[in-house]
Amino acid sequence: YKEIIMRYSKLTMLIPCALLLSACTTVTPAYKDNGTRSGPCVEGGPDNVAQQFYDYRILHRSNDITALRPYLSDKLATLLSDASRDNNHRELLTNDPFSSRTTLPESARVASASTIPNRDARNIPLRVDLKQGDQSWQDEVLMIQEGQCWVIDDVRYLGGSVHATAGTLRQSIENR
């Protein structure tokens, strides 16, 4: 009888210790918060947001920074807004600053982010297959996380006959 009581007393001591230990551990969320975001947000992962951006641009055929704001990082939106008031950037911004070519594409297909090996990455470059008539080319968008939002932070021009002054949108605006 004494042996049974000893076994149960050890068990009754073990249960509160296990509960206390589990209360002291923390769970790390899958996506960490990367600061704040001052602008509106588009729902979805990096590839989904990038595809929505290109779909919106093809449908509306406009470079209106205010309308594109939910898709752009705070820094890129500020750079584009400042550049729109600078005559040196007028040609870049009246053409298509988000593509290697001067004219807007008719179609765009963003590569899947599932091919990215590091799922915790905060900067995700995604290839974009663009098409206008019989011409096809490829560019790359850099997606970053601001707060809980995935947004475009830069465009790398890979499409051959580049109209911009540098290899990326940011470099072209910053005159690098």
Regions found by a protein language model. Name each.
Residues 4-13:
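Bacterial N-terminal signal peptides that target proteins for export
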Residues 20-23:
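C-terminal motif of bacterial Sec signal peptides marking the signal peptidase cleavage site
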Residues 25-27:
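Bacterial signal peptide processing site
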Residues 34-91:
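Core segments of small alpha/beta cavity-forming domains
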Residues 77-136:
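Surface-exposed, charged secondary-structure patches
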Residues 119-123, 127, 133-137, 146, ...:
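Low-complexity, intrinsically disordered terminal/linker segments enriched in charged
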Residues 142-144:
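Short beta-strand edge segments in extracellular beta-sheet folds
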